[in-house]
């Protein structure tokens, strides 16, 4: 699933490409892609004729302000959702779910192989967290002042769950997934199986700082591509080649030479170095 850096990369691409994009026509090819109240019919009414304004991101959610005063267009890519910018008319692929055109015939196409991606239209008189309920459950952004070592200490007090599992909890911190949980724990020198409640304030500060650094580096590299992720222009993310541990199970650690372990934790593959994180 695309995580914060990949979603931020998409947000930046959409902000560049769709500046003043006026939606002349919308086609929903798969109705389950529309998750908002009112379904496809309301979604079509809400977006058709609107001008796309500022794009924002909250965790793994994308949101565009629709102008003038037309509400919010929300998107979650889930496992395999991706946007494609099409300037010349072309036949959509089998996995095309939603299509948007402007008056010039340029198309924004939403393609989703696994079909878990979702879109919402939130009317201007509806609270955003009501229109997109998942937003209400999100914890602070990793780059925010609210995400601090004392915050983590309070939230994880007496918690026996592994710190890797805790980092995947979107209610603790928004936008982190398997890739950057593994990478930040390696950078902080913390074993992923450590009970979260046992971490000291100093360790939590190291983890916070490491997470911010790893996410910043990945955003600068355009995110990570291991399977389906592409940016708006179809370009792969480049962070994967820089990864210290993620998907490197059985290979030598780039830092110390110890073989990277790959364990299952809460059903997720977890990669770590027994020496650097010992």
Curated annotation (Swiss-Prot):
EC number: 3.2.2.23, 4.2.99.18
Cofactor(s), by name: Zn(2+)
UniProt-annotated catalytic positions: 2 (schiff-base intermediate with dna), 3 (proton donor), 60 (proton donor), 268 (proton donor)
FPG-type zinc finger locations on the chain: 244-278
Superkingdom of origin organism: Bacteria
Binding annotation for DNA: 95, 114
GO terms (BP aspect): base-excision repair
Subunit structure: Monomer.
Name of this chain's protein: Formamidopyrimidine-DNA glycosylase
Species annotation: Parasynechococcus marenigrum (strain WH8102)
